[in-house]
Amino acid sequence: MKTTSFISTVVALLGAYSVGVSANLPDTINVHVKNLAPEDTIYDRTRQLFYQSNLWKGMIEVWDNKRQSHFNVKIDGVSSGGDGEQQMSGLSLLTHDNSKRLFAVAKNSHSFDFSPNQKNDGPSSFHCFKLPLSEQSKPEWSVYLQGVQDEFQRQTGRRPFGVVQSAQDRDGNSYIAFALGMPAVAKISPDGKNVEAWAHEDGNGGQRPGYSGITFDPH
């Protein structure tokens, strides 16, 4: 009985606090930007910049918090006004400090459309940028991922799709995680010329399994 009374009191206090805080917030916040949807953020400690992926528009926003300024980096064939075939998902840096490269993963815009319109074979891609970035920056190299998806399907009978994130090892190889179809990771060489169906696991029945992220432990 004492426990029940204590929990009820805590819930009541939390409810009162919640109401008090929310009373000062506006009921509606209007953001007049078409399809603005942040997906991933990474911080460049050396340059003190944030890199933000814009999901729907397929762009990378570079934000300088000190100067309160920003610019967008566009990728040909990926960036759009919000209705393109690809969407920007994960970002990663080659190294924790003094990174010379930024990597960007772009998934097909119909990958996570859980309806009859969902696609597992639409265009998706992976891009390597030299740092520092400018508004005119273009990828040093780009890889389209249909080929490695085909290879996974040939090996396993299942097709991974919905690329979401990448990580880089000490040698500069990239590892790209697929979130849907099957749990799978593709490996890409530092120059982008070799793409390998590197690792996979069996799917979990009729569910849509996969990896939602990946990171590299240097230790």
Regions found by a protein language model. Name each.
Residues 1-23:
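Fungal secretory targeting signals
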Residues 21-36:
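A short helix->beta-strand "capping" segment at the edge of beta-propeller domains
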Residues 27-30, 69-79, 137-148, 195-202:
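Beta-propeller fold detector
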Residues 33-47, 78-108, 143-174, 202-219:
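Beta-rich, blade/repeat-based domains predominating
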Residues 50-76:
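Beta-propeller domains
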Residues 55, 106-109, 179-181, 219:
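Short loop/turn segments immediately following the C-termini of beta-strands
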Residues 64-68, 130-135, 188-193:
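Short loop/turn segments that connect beta-strands within beta-propeller blades
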Residues 118-133:
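Beta-propeller blade signature
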